[in-house]
Amino acid sequence: MWCLPKDDSKAVITAQDQIHSAHRECHLQLPETAILFFMGKATDYLISQYNATELPEPLPRFLNSCPIWEIGKFQLCFADGGRGAPQAVDTIETLAALGVRNIISVGMCGAYDEVVHVGEIIAPQKAFVEEGTSLHYYEDIEYSKPDGNLQKAVTSLLGIRNYSIVSTDAVYRQTLCKEQLWRDKGAVGVDMET
């Protein structure tokens, strides 16, 4: 029982509820664009290199609030997106409830195809869904795709290549058989947040 097409009942808790809960009252004013990092030291680098300012309140997501920073001259904010699909979606829904409209996710994937080299930056053209969180949002979904305009801009600006990946939440269930099925679909790597 995942996404029920005829279920129009209210959610028990929403990101908006979390933001304005009895535990806290959030007054964050965020820019329209946020960058989420799903890897360790990326936020530390931006803080040191771009004179980022930590906002006075943490991002009040349900699964562990976290600091959020702003780089004023770029009209964007950034934060750690968490680990795994549930925390990624929690972060995205919280940002959306706070008025953020554009979210760019930056993370790492484990490549299992030699066409991708260690340290290479790629832009996923498709992310095949192998995790459970997406199934709470879509009745039937095989893969997700990024915004086409953003995909083109990032690819041309950074001079990177596009490949398909797989997003999973079962680290220890990546079998050689599954890997071959993913390769047959054109995927070159696997992550946990896309």
Range-by-range predicted roles:
Residues M1-I104, G110-T194:
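Accessory terminal and edge-of-domain segments that mediate assembly/interaction
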